[in-house]
Amino acid sequence: MRSFIHKTLKPSPFLLSTITTATLTPLSISQLHPNHVRSMSSGRIFQLKLDPLTGKSEWVVIEEEDEAHDAPPQQPLLAATSYLDMLNDSRRNRAFREAIDKTITKPCHVLDIGAGTGLLSMMAARAMDSAMSTACSSSEGAVTACESYLPMVKLMRKVLRLNGMERKVRVINKRSDELEVGVDITSRADILVSEILDSELLGEGLIPTLQHAHDKLLVENPQTVPYRATTYGQLVESKYLWKLHDLFDVEAKASDDIRLVPTKKETILCVKAQQFAMHCDAIKDEIKLLSEPFKIFEFDFWKRPESRGETKLHIKATNDGTVHAVVSWWILQLDCEGTIYYSTGPKWISFPFNMELQRTLPSSGDWCDHWKQCVYFIPGKGLPISKDEELHLHATHNDTSISYEFETQARGTEIDQYEIARDDQLILPPERVAIYGDSNWRWSVLKAVKKAVQGKVSSLCLVVDDSVFLTIAIAHLSKTSHVIALFPGLREKGAKYLQAVAVANGFSMDQIEVLGKRKDKLTMHDTHQKKVELLVGEPYYYGNDSMLPWQNLRFWKERTALDPVLASDALIMPCKGILKACAMSLPDLWRSRRCLSQIEGFDHSAVNATLGACGDLPEPQESPCLPYFIWQCGENKRLSEVFTVMEFDFSKPISQCFGKAQVEFTEARICHGFALWIDWVIDVDNSIVLSTGPDQRHWKQGVKLLAEPVTVGTHGSSLGNTSAEIETSFNPSSGELNIKYVFT
């Protein structure tokens, strides 16, 4: 699960003085990455944590203590990761169990890298016991579980004890590349079982992990589970995918004068040239297939892989159209004979001539979030093609990623590719690029800015977040205003970008000042002895894309801290935030987060509280609220009208807030939880409101899943509960939103 490179969902933060006395919010851990985890003495690590309401980070200590004391602090560490979703993936679990049973036929040394809860290690130990009893062998085998992340190691030991496996599996709390034969393990391993795969296949460090294992930890010609992984791709046309990356051409159609991407600077604001994980089935009706699926790379686990590889593919177009993206996925062959497979392919794929592969494809009940398809955007407007035209695709890979480059035989030249990053280039997430290209969003924001600056002369405007759009818009629309941009995430990069686009947007850099460094508080010295008349934010904070919606109330906290430099009649934009919610049917998402019991014969009930599962958790524990793009969560349906839960008034200092609402159900169905988000009221007249709800596909919503699904019905029906009462409270110190509900 996790080995050479740590990679989990990005949590949400809370400034801590000690790990043992504080309760963390869900999503409060920095992305687990070698730079964010530091080893100390044995049984102790540093973990980087971020406070969502200040943007500050701090190293805290996680110690290996008695399990009786570590349950409360550990829950948030792992509840926001993909472990629970992965363990609920029955297709995956079954495939690994069948392959391990088939591969381990005699006593041997098995190494499990990135062992997680120890599921594969226990499968290996059980298979070895069975093989030994069948063969009546007197020799002994061994199973070694290698897991580098201390909270996961502690959880694995609980699971092993619960299943009576603690003496059959040896646990080592190290990275796999730190293991030494003769020091950590007595001999090289005969069999490797491992699952260190992400949606792209390589992103969790599969290649360097296998390289080190073959060099230092495995016998020559070892057996492995999985045996092989093959990546596949398909060319697609999709305007939705195009708008996620090509801001230059999308913006050219805008009716306003703002140019975030001016002519001859087409890549100055763009997405990273990489594959992006996405549930492509959710947009299948917006995709036009332009080719048959094609094989790209094969990676054999049983031999040492190369760090770099390339292949040139000849692909025949099956339709006229424009190639906007390469959609890719992978298929695992888990056994050497080729009878056990697992696929992450989209549901529109079929293998009519290979029933073994056909059975690997996900069905309607097989949705999972830990492995998705991947999308690689074709630069610019895409590549126009004609049916039966032959396309040349050059695919390359390095240690951790796969990339693509097109060349057309007719033209004999490569199409424009992503430029090498420059100092003034901004790399933003696809959803942020799409927001900046959305004509309705731009119109609303510009209308609000025009109203705000109208009649103001030589005013001081303060942009508190990372909004380059607002900064440019104010400077463009108010030539006499002076704009100070804090850019807490973009910093100097944002300043260089503004300088590069200033001429195209009709403003001078004399109008704009980027502080370029984080400051706890601004003083009158920073504002040149002037009071701020306009304080604005979208709000958008660079790098916080995986936060819960209400953690953008950092804007409110920063507005409060800036009170000493605000004019008495200062205009705050947005002026208000409204917490909205609706009841949802989310069967696929709920199944992926449900409590675990038996997994292929092994009791995993010990992990439920720690992983934040939905179900019968001991009081007062409950599953956390987590951020999701609801439209990508498999089957989903709204069961109520949208209702207001709570309001946040930014004209006043940040404070604790409470809200209560009664909701009537509009659909007779099974309710799995509630979606929550914030609508930002931009102007004081309440006439311009920007919603971030489920209908807006570029924002994540917070999802509060129920402990158990509830049957609901409409008013007057006899089919279950007809209404629910929601109570919420917001903690301004931690950024936590507490949610309680009662069905009636």
Question: Model-derived features: where do they sit?
Answer:
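N-terminal chloroplast transit peptides
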Residues: 1-28
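Class I SAM-binding transferase module
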Residues: 2, 33-113, 118-744
